[in-house]
Amino acid sequence: MSRVPRILLVVAIILSLASMAEAKTVSIKAVTAWPKSVWEVGNFMKFLDIVKERVAQKYPGQLEIQYAGGPEVIPNQEQVEAARMGVVDMVFTTDGYYVSAVPEINALSVSMLDGWEERAKGVNALLDKIHQEKVNCVYLGRLGHNLPFTIYLTKPVKGLDDLKGLKIRCSPTLVGFLKKIGSNPVVIPPPEVYTALERGVVDGFTWPAGLIKDWGWEKVTKCVVQPGVYNGANVIVINKKKWDEIPADLQKLLIEAEDEAARLAKQRALDLVKNEKEALQKMGVQYVELPPAEAKKLTDAAYSALWDIILEKSPANGPKLKEMVTK
């Protein structure tokens, strides 16, 4: 090898090593609204696995997501505020836990689209703009739905009228819906639900289908009302300053990883709902399928209640979102 090519090779190696030395590892501290053992967090863990694998393949050492824990670290309804302030960088949560700060996020609960379809139709871009303005966070996307909120009861019922007057535990998202069907909504944190059911403080609860065994609530469940309503809107948000620290190619990687994880989460959810129904029926739990007319009353009450709130609290963005997410 002549002297000039040899010098060029040495220079190339030096520049390559310098570039590697300059590549700074971006570290993201993440929390989830539920403990790691809860099924929903499994979708987030899959997302973390996909990110880790892709980073190792394409950008080794440049990005890491450190999972700090669930509500034992920061209470679930305070996590998005913690991300806004930069106490944590990434939050995996659900709409009901920060709807007071971002009312528009409820539109995902009545969305007729899958998460990746929402991105393609511009829903994510609009929600991202809203999140940046209201909570200083970037909206990465929806991760996990297809688990309709379902009414589980400690006593059997025959129809929609039997739900009137019953005290039913719910998240803030479902308060308006339960009032419309004549039930009495009671907002109770998940860890307190079992005791409330056992002591008769409430007659039942609403929860995403397929997930009640995470909390042991199947032991006090006698009846399940069908159909369910809404789609659980579990989402990932990231502190804006932290997002801006992430190079564009790694931002793209995170978005693509979220979309892949969302597709896997959909099938995982469909399988889960089927398995729960089979297991509960074997335990003697009664599934009550409302007649078509009553089922329509139930779903109409659910969707109109939530859209009423969204449109009232967000007259500028609510109509846009409704048009986007309605097929």
What are these regions (language model features)?
Residues R3, E22-T25:
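N-terminal leader/targeting segments
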Residues L15, S19-A23:
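Sec/Tat signal peptide C-region and signal peptidase I cleavage site
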Residues M1-L8:
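Bacterial N-terminal signal peptides that target proteins for export
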Residues K24-L113, Q132-K327:
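N-terminal secretory/targeting leader peptides
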Residues L8-S16:
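Bacterial N-terminal signal peptides
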Residues G115-I130, K134:
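A gly/proline- and charged-residue-enriched helix-loop-helix capping module
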